[in-house]
Amino acid sequence: MAAKHVKYMACLFDMDGLLVDSETIYTKTTNLILDRYGKDPLPISVKAQMMGRPGSAAAKVVIDWSNIPMTPQQFVDEQQVIRAKFWSSLKPMPGAESLINNLSNHGIDIGLATSSNTANYNMKTAHLKHIFEKFGKNVITGDNPSIAPGRGKPFPDIWLKVLNLINESRKQRGLKALTPSQCIAFEDSIPGVKSAKAAGMHVIWVPDAAIKNLVGDQLNEIVDSQCETLPSLSEFDINKYLNINSKQA
């Protein structure tokens, strides 16, 4: 659990499966490809390994499991074509819109660290600009050139890059730079949780119930003094965690 008297100054978010229900679409389109090769649907245990990883890394997981005759890039390209028709129907996850609005209204710095590449990010959010415009320039996508190849989640780089953007914005406003320990990172995937913890941030893990159940005895390795879990973003209490009365420090 979080320390009782700690107050955080910024909130950083993953996107897929946390802010938008894209994981349902990912699973559906993956199963369409697997079915074409006569393979079984994607099991939750493999799905858990894919979540939070950049596209090519996630593709490698499913290819290694299924032995389908595709390269990771071929798999990514095929999924891109199939998924394109679904993105316009993508819906926010419960509590996501209200939380982002609440943070924005209180002047809390927010940022987005998504493994989605820029093209996918734009397609997923085109009809949700009223939510994602709140992040301003504090967005790093999985194909951002500042993230070295092979350094996506579970490495900490993407969170630290987003924090750099937040601090650049704070400097322009005459505010002090924040350290990772002053930030909360919201994640739904295990690789993402590991990534944010490695960055030195406090983590709020909002997992799919099936993923959480799959973890079993390893739960204590994930949920510790640096990480806690919530069933939904709607359960997050900003007054408990955030320094909303002295945000200009």
From Swiss-Prot:
Against SUPFAM superfamilies, the record matches this protein to:
HAD-like
* Gene3D superfamilies (alphabetical): HAD superfamily/HAD-like, Putative phosphatase, domain 2
What are the recorded GO MF terms, alphabetically?
A: phosphatase activity; pseudouridine 5'-phosphatase activity
An example GO biological process term is: rRNA catabolic process
Q: What InterPro entries does the database record attribute to this sequence?
A: Gpp1/Gpp2-like (IPR045228), HAD-like_sf (IPR036412), HAD-SF_hydro_IA (IPR006439), HAD_sf (IPR023214), PGP-like_dom2 (IPR023198)
Gene Ontology terms: cellular component = cytosol; mitochondrion; nucleus
UniProt similarity note: Belongs to the HAD-like hydrolase superfamily. CbbY/CbbZ/Gph/YieH family.
Check the record and name the NCBIfam families matching this protein. HAD-SF-IA-v3 (TIGR01509)
Q: What is this protein called?
A: Uncharacterized protein C4C5.01
- Which source organism? Schizosaccharomyces pombe (strain 972 / ATCC 24843)
